Curated annotation (Swiss-Prot):
It comes from the Bacteria. This is Uncharacterized 17.2 kDa protein in melC2-rnhH intergenic region. InterPro entries: COQ10_START, ORF3, START-like_dom_sf. Pfam families: Polyketide_cyc.
Length: 150
């Protein structure tokens, strides 16, 4: 298993950052390589990704979700093996630190080489930077799910 940890400060309140992160179907607008996400149930999403010519489909189960604090997931079945958590830390009324931690298993030779060269870390950093731009330009979330999964 490989690991990646990245964080970014966003200029919105913690509830705004959290609410936007729960809108999984908007991820393709700021995550490179994510083609589509379907929210199938409150705790199950279906992902279609394509990174450097490697196409994958998989389901991710939300294993823990606490409003304004964290969203944790693990993949179930499909073509990807990963687990992670995104946490939200209030810095002040208008700023939030978003931290992403993920464990993943690179399968193909392309994925293994990309992992060794730091591609996943750079991609994650870029995704968080695009999330920052996405939410700050709007100033508000596109929606939000406030339920808890424990």
């Amino acid at each position: 298993m490989s690991k990646v940890e990245e964080s970014i400060e966003v200029g919105v309140p913690v509830h705004t950052a959290y609410n936007q992160w729960t809108q999984f179907e908007t991820f393709p607008q700021f995550m490179s390589g994510v083609e589509r996400i379907e929210q199938r149930t409150d705790t199950l999403t279906h992902w279609v990704t394509s990174v450097n010519g490697v196409h994958k489909e998989f389901d991710a189960e939300i294993t823990e979700q606490i409003p304004d604090e964290r969203v944790a997931w693990t993949t179930v079945g499909g073509e990807a093996e990963q687990a992670g958590v995104v946490t939200f830390h209030r810095l002040d009324d208008d700023h939030t630190k978003v931290m992403l931690q993920m464990d993943f298993h690179p399968d193909s030779v392309t994925e293994k080489v990309g992992d060794k060269l730091g591609f996943v870390k750079r991609q994650t950093k870029g995704d968080l930077e695009r999330f920052k731009k996405f939410i700050e330009e709007r100033g508000q979330e596109t929606g939000g799910w406030r339920g808890a999964v424990i």
